[in-house]
Amino acid sequence: GLACGALLKEAGVIDHWKFAHPKDLQDGLVEVNEDDCLANVPYVEGCGLWFDHHSSEHERLELAGKYKGESRTAPSCARIIYEYYGGKERFPQFDDMMEAVDKVDSGHLTIDEVMNPKGWILIGFLMDPRTGLGRWREFTISNYQLMEKLIDACRTMTTAEILALPDVKERIEVYNEQTEKFKQMVSQYT
């Protein structure tokens, strides 16, 4: 969601956004119209643009020719948006982010990248809802608010600058506190 949002904003496609759970979209709990651009979530009839990288959506809905945008198998939805709007020529500042997003989303990470994440991979882990950091409620701002803030940060700041933001640093602290427990669990059960 974060990389897709940063790319879409940089391309001038969006000026506001909402992060929604895929099931909420499928169940019709989120209103969608022709002004909406959906990314990395299931297709909803009536949206203006749709980008996805999950082949299951085409199989489920037989969508060929029914939408504007692009959907195909790729390492990440961000990769599809990146290429759709011009790739490296349009987004030269996003090379490192794109490499990390593709790795994190597709799971093509080395053991060292999982055990000792740095840079964009660490940012990806911190912002992925599956990491579970959202259940710690003592953060200054919510994970949702941080996601909103980071859409612009990803476009204008280096990874070092992003990782130094107070709202990110407090999440790194919690993440690192949990690292030893994680390492013990991985070594015990793999």
Positions of predicted regions on the chain:
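Hydrophobic helix-and-loop "lid/oligomerization" segment in the mid-to-C-terminal part
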Residues: 2-3, 9, 14, 109-190
